[in-house]
Amino acid sequence: VSVEAELGRLAGEEDGLSVDERDARMTDPAIVAAFLARTRVDALAVTVGNVHGAYASRDPDLDWARLDAVRAAAGDVPLVLHGASGLSQRVISRAISAGVCKFNVNTELRAAARAAYAEGGDVLAAAERATSAMAGVVEAKLLAFDAGS
């Protein structure tokens, strides 16, 4: 069994957050090593300006210095980025270079499935379309992640 923990609190959106509130939600590099030693988790999900859900029109303003500091404090523990749906190739590549090994893209997968089901028709045919659409998202993401490494 692999255990992943998120250190920090990932918001559902960024709008309406002041800098102080936003910083308070982010992973604190100063406590990463102690947290990992205490919990012995297999992977660490970080909060560096990423949010759950889709980004409206542009990449999020990720705190790259914070991510680099977390990477240094985490040692060989793999880093995870929740809220990675819709990130550009530039951001994916930069995150990989900073040690992110796993990206959660649930919003993109659900959007693909929803679009397939919205076409209507037989439920089994819709399920097959949804599965195919999600497989297409997975394939595109694997190619993007591979290109970023």
Predicted regions and their residues:
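Alpha/beta enzyme core
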Residues: V1-G75, Q89, S93-A98, V105, ...
